[in-house]
Design a protein with these regions (language model features):
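Ferredoxin-type iron-sulfur electron-transfer modules in oxidoreductases and energy-metabolism complexes
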Residues: 1, 40-176
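A basic, amphipathic helix-loop patch mediating RNA/tRNA/ribosome contacts
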Residues: 1-21
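A generic local secondary-structure boundary/capping motif
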Residues: 5, 29-33, 99
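Short active-site-adjacent helix-start/loop capping segments
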Residues: 11, 15-17, 27, 37, ...
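Short phosphate-engaging motifs
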Residues: 16, 24, 174-176
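Glycine-rich phosphate/adenylate-binding loop and adjacent beta-alpha elements
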Residues: 20-37, 42-44
Length: 176
């Protein structure tokens, strides 16, 4: 038997991430005709930079540990007296792309820095950090930026190869 993950078949859950001919992809939205139109050989592998559990299944423990390093939740300085804490559309516009992340790990799989430095926070965590540092409702912007700037494995360890941007199935462009 062959072990693999899949769930939605609509590229919204991110569970089916794998390497196809060396690049991370969501296989539920990857058509063989697009990759091998003339019947070329396909190589399907588990995602990179993550521990292989079995066959094409990888452990996401490291992935989520990287995400946790950026405190991935909104931390406002006060709670509104009534209703929701609403931000204007204009103030949230620059976050729309990062909010599309489905946490599939394709960017982490193909990150060239993570191949040589397991301490690097990784592109998914950096995209998640961007989502909260730029949210006008969040009060921890300076603290988040300090962690990203000062800690070993932070943002300055990125080599800007932009492989994460190239493989992101949702166009999040974590390092663009």
């Amino acid at each position: 038997t062959l072990a693999l993950r899949c769930a939605c078949r609509a590229s919204i859950c991110g569970s089916c991430g794998m390497k196809v001919n060396g690049d991370a992809k969501l296989v539920c939205k990857t058509r063989v005709d697009d990759i091998a139109p003339n019947g070329e050989q396909l190589v399907i592998e588990p995602m990179g930079n993550q521990h292989v559990v079995r066959d094409l299944v990888v452990s996401l423990d490291t992935f989520f540990s990287q995400i946790k390093r950026v405190d991935p939740f909104l931390q406002p300085d006060h709670v509104p007296e009534q209703g929701e804490y609403i931000a204007s559309d204009d103030s949230m516009e620059n976050l729309l792309t990062s909010m599309n992340c489905i946490m599939c790990g394709c960017c982490v799989s193909d990150c060239t820095v993570l191949e040589v430095d397991a301490n690097f926070i990784g592109p998914a965590a950096l995209a998640k950090a961007w989502r909260f540092t730029e949210d006008p409702r969040d009060s921890k912007r300076d603290e988040r930026l300090k962690v990203l700037n000062d800690e070993a494995g932070g943002i300055w360890d990125c080599t800007r190869c932009l492989k994460c941007v190239e493989v992101c199935p949702k166009g999040v462009a974590p390092m663009d």
